[in-house]
Amino acid sequence: MVKEMNGNALNVEHDINIHLENKKVSRHFFVFLFLMYAIVYMTKNCFSGALADIVADGVLTKSQTGLITALFYLAYTPLQIVGGIVADKHSPEFLIKVGLFGSAVANAIIFFNHNYYVMLVVWTLNAMIQFALWPGTYKIITSQLCRSDKSFMIFFISIASTLGLLMSYVVAAILPSWEMNFAVSAAALFILTVIMHVYDKHLNRFMIRDYEPISINSGKSTYGGSTFSLFMKSGFFLLLIPVVIRCLVGQGSKTLAPLMLHEIFKTDPSFGNLLNVLIILAGLCGTLLVKLVLYPRIVKNELLGLIICGSILLGFTVAFVFAPTMPLTVVSLCGIALFSTAASLFISYFNASFAKYGKNGTAAGISNAAASFGIVLLNYGILKISEIWGWDYVRYLWLALSALLIICAVGVFFINKGFKKSEKQN
């Protein structure tokens, strides 16, 4: 591979099938992408982070706040599939800038206008403008940055979402009012847009063009079928059920904990947010457990790792159901957060395996769509269940879902094993 001549200089805002081989430049850009996605994830959770304060102040009801977040992910979910396909065909850097700028505008509007219906519409539009932000980020990491660093970059970018979620609750606890969450988010996103644009110009001279696009029929892979067939036969589509469940249970343990503790044990909302920091940090430990201990030293198969983490997750969910006191409830929620996050990283490693077919962006988009659908169910369905029947029903539902996650993960393991065997034979 050679750099383009000056007359045909590469432009990351237009060219695809390009990559960096300069490790220093690649790693610096990744650090920016890591911080960027952490902040983006923080801004996506503005309503969740301030949920207890918004409800306590009487600004919105629990159902109204849940509906705003649910509609965000209801719009976000199908568009992630579109975003994944688009990120495989167009510049992911340009798509990221569109998402950053649009989200900054949405956060600024909500800071100045607290009308419920305005919030509902603007936050839904915010979801739509971010349609390719995550698929674009994942595409850059798994295809454009230095490929020898790919495993570590997938590991660290999974930490970014945990860090972003943690920041959303820390910021909510520190700021004097819930409205300031949106002011801080808007300012941060505007700054990120500018930095991303400057970085794009800087990267052009370091980019190298691939010899040819990596596609299903390029000879890079022995599989010659359609994308749908690839995802079906590899077990990817069945894996989407554990993805949804992981969000319902794992994400629920992080985002609903302050409200749950407030309503069950009458804890102060601010104290609940601080306790939630422990739960989110436990989730971060799950990521570290996978990368530093389990994979690939002890567990060499991503799907086997998912089964192991799902089994331990089920044990902590049982403890959560029968926990009689607040300390035991918090400990069980920490365990749920830890092993659900570990399971999520194994899923990310599995999705990265589709890079050899040129479908890693599509896989990331579809997987993120499934996760977003889980968050829709979490923020409206689970909140509605807690409002009508109470938190005990939520506990038993999470227990049943944790068991279903293991069943589906085992199914995917055997389907994928057969798929790999047939690939080798062909």
Go through each PLM region and give its residues.
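Juxtamembrane intracellular "pre-TM" segments in multi-pass secondary transporters
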Residues: E13-K23, N204-L239
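Extracytoplasmic gate region of multi-pass secondary transporters
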Residues: F47-S48, S234-T287
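Conserved MFS/SLC helix-loop-helix module at the cytosolic interface between two early adjacent transmembrane helices
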Residues: P78-H114
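Helix-to-loop junctions at the C-terminal end of transmembrane segments
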Residues: L79-S91, G286-K300, S386
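Cytoplasmic helix-loop-helix junction between adjacent transmembrane helices
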Residues: V122-A160
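Helix-loop-helix hairpin linking two adjacent transmembrane segments in secondary transporters
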Residues: F156-N204
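C-terminal transmembrane helical hairpin of 12-TM major facilitator-type secondary transporters
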Residues: K300-F346
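A late C-terminal transmembrane helix in Major Facilitator Superfamily
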Residues: F354-W391
